[in-house]
Amino acid sequence: MFFQLSGDFEARKILAQLSGLTPNDTTNKHSAKIIFGDERKPQKDFVYTDLSKTFPGYVYDFGKSTYRGETTGEGGYVYSEPGMYYNVAVLDVASMHPTSIEQLNLFGPYTKRFSDLKKARVLIKHGDVEAAGKILDLHIDETTNLKGLSDALKTVLNSVYGLTSAHFDNPFRDLRNKDNIVAKRGALFMIDLKHAVQDLGYQVVHIKTDSIKIPDATPEVIAFIMEFGRKYGYEFEHECTYEKMCLVNDAVYIAKKINGDKSVWESVGAQFAHPYVFKKMFSREKIE
């Protein structure tokens, strides 16, 4: 068990090194310390954005959000047109929620520190450890556990979004933020993107929070989506193109993609992911 969790413990120790707290302190305490320092009430400097000014027509009323004739939900936007499709481009927004926090300047003067953590993780991923060390004010050399450092930063970045929308009191919670504007900005953006792509004559068959799928995609529509995202501060990545995809509903699909010289099946949802079903019907792996 120790060896299985040793990587997590290494990340925990690096988290403590960044925050100055102990490895036994909670993730929430580490995150607050790293971003807000010793400020106990950072909320007084937070920025709350009325999204109806950025997205005219958006309404939040008695816990229900509507925009462009749709009920958006209070988390990520989900949309599907079940069916069988071919040549399906899959494009994902890189770090949607952290980017929304940056674009909203959610934490006011503390947003830069949050952005620095995000930048440092990208730099580590690309091997520029010297620049990452300068941003973090941390000495990094050949003995540094880079995976542990990256995991520690990921822990902070991932925990912060949940804390902004939590119903319990914490340093990241703004009482004005009733409509979860971090997730909502991404959702409203994806609705605008869906309409923009449809207006070009393409079909949008699936949207799941930060991902969009378009069948019979051309290089032109892929370039359009990437440029559309940049206008809102989002960077899209062309994750893959499915040779074919069977979409059952907004949470279940099976798809085949070309990976180098061979085809690879990818399943999402319990029905197709069941080992016997997946191996017997799709991957043709030996069933033991």
Feature roles, as predicted:
Residues 42-167:
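Catalytic nucleotidyl-transfer cores of nucleotide-processing enzymes
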Residues 150-194:
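Signature for HUH/AEP ssDNA processing cores
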Residues 1-99, 176, 180, 185-219, ...:
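Conserved "right-hand" nucleotidyltransferase catalytic core of DNA-directed polymerases
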Residues 27, 128-129, 145, 283-286:
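Alpha-helix capping and helix-coil boundary motifs
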Residues 88-89, 110-113, 145-149, 174, ...:
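Catalytic cores of large soluble enzymes that bind and process phosphate-bearing ligands
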Residues 78-85, 123, 131-144, 167-181, ...:
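Glycine- and acidic
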Residues 11-17, 51, 113-123, 253, ...:
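Generic hydrophobic, helix-prone segments enriched in Leu/Val/Ile
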Residues 215-288:
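C-terminal polymerase-core module
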